[in-house]
């Protein structure tokens, strides 16, 4: 038998799962967490559809890539940071931001027309008052 024979039982090694090491930045909040937390609110205030879709995609990405240790910490009410929100809340906020941006399709708002008669009357009155004062000073 050759040494490279795969069928030999002494060459078989069972698989042992090894957890990857924690990264340098895993314990500290990153800039993506700040952006992920503030984008849904920016979409709500600005009613910008691009920002709303961006926040939804980013929240789904954060939700799918959240570490299991962080989820367990949230369930035990031991969040890594007091300002950090659970991934489900971030996803819910981005969905609300998207709904607010498209709310005009369900509840359209009428644009107020400027009244043309009110502004002309005020302008004419001001001109007449000015000419009356000028004529009175010219007579004296």
Swiss-Prot record:
Glycans are attached at residue 36. It is a single-pass membrane protein. GO terms for cellular component: endoplasmic reticulum; endoplasmic reticulum membrane. Residues 113-122 have a biased composition (Polar residues). It is found in: Endoplasmic reticulum membrane. PANTHER family: ADL329WP. This is Uncharacterized protein YPR063C. It comes from Saccharomyces cerevisiae (strain ATCC 204508 / S288c) (Baker's yeast).
């Amino acid at each position: 038998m050759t040494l490279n024979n795969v069928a030999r039982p002494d060459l078989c090694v069972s698989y042992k799962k090894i957890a990857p090491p924690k990264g340098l930045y895993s314990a500290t909040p990153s800039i993506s967490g700040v952006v992920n937390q503030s984008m849904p609110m920016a979409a709500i205030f600005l009613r910008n559809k691009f920002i709303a879709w961006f926040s939804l995609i980013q929240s789904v990405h954060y939700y799918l890539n959240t570490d299991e240790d962080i989820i367990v910490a949230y369930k035990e009410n031991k969040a890594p940071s007091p300002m950090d929100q659970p991934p489900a809340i971030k996803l819910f906020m981005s969905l609300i931001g998207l709904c607010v941006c498209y709310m005009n399709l369900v509840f359209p708002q009428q644009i107020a027309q400027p009244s043309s008669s009110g502004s002309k009357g005020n302008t004419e009155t001001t001109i007449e008052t000015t000419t009356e004062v000028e004529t009175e000073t010219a007579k004296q």
